[in-house]
From Swiss-Prot:
One of its GO terms (molecular function) is 2 iron, 2 sulfur cluster binding. The C-terminal domain binds 2 Fe-S clusters but is otherwise mostly in an intrinsically disordered conformation. The N-terminal domain has structural similarity with S-adenosyl-L-methionine-dependent methyltransferases, but does not bind S-adenosyl-L-methionine. It is required for correct assembly of the 2 Fe-S clusters. [4Fe-4S] cluster binds at residues 311, 314, 322, 325. One of its GO terms (cellular component) is mitochondrial intermembrane space. A motif (Cx2C motif 1) lies at residues 311-314. Residues 144-163 have a biased composition (Polar residues). It comes from the Eukaryota. Residues 1-162 are annotated as: N-terminal SAM-like domain. A motif (Cx2C motif 2) lies at residues 322-325. Its main location: cytoplasm. Residues 252-268 are annotated as: Fe-S binding site A. This is Fe-S cluster assembly protein DRE2.
Length: 348
């Protein structure tokens, strides 16, 4: 049993619906000589209801149905899993989405043969490395081939052929006195540029036409003789219709009467008269309709001599009667036959 590696199996809550996936994972781990000594749900570890021991497991396997590119794992648990692993322990089940968090928590990412994270040994990371310092070589130091290093001499002042420069003589420069009058250059004011206007020929032609039409109208009114006598309004009225009123009132087609409608603020009593007429019409419409004996015989088929009813099918039975027929439920009978309870006692 000691040859098996101790492992921890973390399960996503969605995997609980497929227990065969858990069994297959355990079988694959057993083939690699890994035995899961503990098995927890990831949400239990996330909410703190379960705590892990430090440096207890050699392998931690996270089982989830999510794709590698869609894995959602609490980042705070990466450090918890790192503490629970032994040095050189492996974490399986996460992807490169949390690559930065893995490097921060001391994991080394392995891509081959299987993708996993390996916890690096902290003792090796904290070891100090001594770096030997090289001694300064002298001029007599020889190279590995046996030849000496090249030497360089400092150039002397006598052997240097650098160019020489002389300071300029300020005495030869022109001196400007304050008494000398300085005349600034004169400038002439530029003349305004000429502006040339380009006019379309079509616009000029239209303007000429408008001007000619206006002038022709003015000439026409000048030629009109204003001395002519104006036409009087009375001359426009015919002699036959001069004595008759031109305004007519529309008469009713039925009553042949001419009646004016009452004004909105009527004070002559016409509005009250119209209201009375309207009330009379409404009262006639509200009267209860009463049937005479002759009218009742047309709808009551039980009277002698009346062979049919209102719909003509009441005597045939319920299958032929209307929904509001008063004889619903009674057996079929002959038209004109009196109905009593003795005749239907067998059906009751």
């Amino acid at each position: 049993m000691s040859q098996y590696k101790t492992g921890l199996l973390l399960i996503h809550p969605a995997v609980t619906t497929t227990p065969e996936l858990v069994e297959n994972t355990k079988a694959q781990a057993a083939s690699k000589k890994v035995k899961f000594v503990d098995q927890f749900l990831i949400n239990k570890l996330n909410d703190g209801s379960i705590t892990l021991e430090n440096a207890k497991y050699e392998t931690v396997h996270y089982l989830t149905p999510e794709a590698q590119t869609d894995i959602k794992f609490p980042k705070k648990l990466i450090s918890v899993l790192a503490d629970s692993l032994k040095p050189n322990g492996s974490l399986i089940g996460l992807s490169d989405i949390y690559k930065v968090d893995a490097l921060i928590n001391g994991f080394e990412i392995i891509n081959e043969p299987d993708y996993c994270w390996i916890k690096m040994d902290s003792s090796k990371l904290n070891q100090t490395v001594s770096i030997p310092l090289k001694k300064k070589k002298t001029n007599n130091t020889k190279l590995q081939s046996g030849s000496k290093l090249p030497t360089f001499k400092k150039a002397s002042s006598s052997t240097s052929n650098l160019p020489s420069f002389k300071k300029a003589d300020h005495s030869r420069q022109p001196i400007v006195k304050e008494t000398d009058s300085f005349k600034p250059p004169s400038f002439k004011m530029a003349t305004e540029p000429k502006v040339y206007r380009v006019v379309d020929d079509l616009i000029e032609d239209s303007d000429d036409d408008d001007f000619s039409s206006d002038s022709s109208k003015a000439q026409y009114f000048d030629q009109v003789d204003t001395s002519d006598d104006s036409i009087e309004e009375e001359e426009l009225i015919d002699e036959d219709g001069s004595g008759k009123s031109m305004i007519t009132m529309i008469t009713c087609g039925k009553s042949k009467t001419k009646k004016k409608k009452a004004c909105k603020d009527c004070t002559c009593g016409m509005k009250e008269q119209e209201g009375k007429e309207i009330n009379d019409i409404r009262s006639q419409q509200d009267k209860v309709v009463k049937f005479t004996e002759d009218e009742l015989t047309e709808i009551d088929f039980t009277i002698d001599g009346k062979k049919v009813g209102g719909c003509g099918s009441c005597s045939l039975g319920d299958a032929f009667r209307c929904s509001g027929c008063p004889y619903l439920g009674l057996p079929a009978f002959k038209p004109g036959q009196p109905i009593n309870l003795d005749s239907i006692s067998d059906d009751l």
